[in-house]
Regions:
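Hydrophobic, small-residue-rich alpha-helical packing segments that form membrane-like cores
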Residues: 1-33
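Active-site neighborhoods of metal-dependent hydrolases
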Residues: 36, 41-199
């Protein structure tokens, strides 16, 4: 690809706390390979990043353009995303597929480790931390006894069950064999407008 005018369009590896580090990696790719780079769905996920990371990211892109690089971005135009609930788990927790994940979710020691990793943050886009348990709403549940919880947040369900949100989430994942979808609210309208208004 070096020196060819073939654009590389990417979803960055991190869109939360290290979104600027991930952007710098892609700008380095543009510099080293001398190719156009387009960032797809630029966003800064998580309340801690709202209003601060996007202006910095846009400034980095503008500076790169002033250096002569052909770089740009588009915007994810929604404040929420939709995916499977298992994506609150670190990628390595999913090793072995659902046949391994479900027993792991039952294990109290594994849950304690999971809680610590979510609290600490360890490099993955941690949806539980970025959206908050109140920002994760369940959109499909298969077991009839869970149907009343459709549309409710993990925080709401945990309060109804008298549990902490992580245990509630793990219990639901076990019962539903990890086949739960969610809407996660982790972006802000202000950042979307800022990106849309940038040159």
């Amino acid at each position: 690809l070096t020196g060819q005018n073939i654009p590389v369009t990417v979803h960055m590896r991190q869109e939360g706390g290290d979104v600027l580090g991930a952007l710098e990696e892609m700008l380095t790719v543009a510099r080293v390979l001398r190719i156009p780079v387009h960032i797809s769905h630029l966003k800064a996920m998580g309340r801690d990043n709202w209003g601060t990371k996007i202006p910095q990211a846009l400034s980095m892109l503008e500076q790169a353009r002033q250096e002569g690089l052909d770089v740009g971005c588009d915007v994810y135009p929604y404040t929420a995303g939709s995916t499977q609930l298992i994506h609150i788990l670190p990628p390595d927790f999913l090793t072995g597929g659902m046949e391994a994940v479900v027993p792991r979710l039952r294990d109290k020691d594994a849950r304690r480790e999971l809680a610590e990793r979510i609290r600490r943050g360890d490099g993955f886009d941690d949806i539980a931390k970025l959206a908050g348990w109140d920002g994760i709403r369940l959109t499909s549940l298969h077991c009839p006894e869970d149907h009343p919880y459709q549309g409710k947040s993990i925080a709401e369900i945990a309060a109804l069950w008298g549990q902490n949100p992580l245990d509630c989430c793990c219990d639901l994942l076990v019962r539903e064999h990890c086949e739960i979808t969610m809407v996660d609210f982790m972006a802000t309208e202000e950042d979307i407008v800022t990106i849309l208004q940038s040159p």
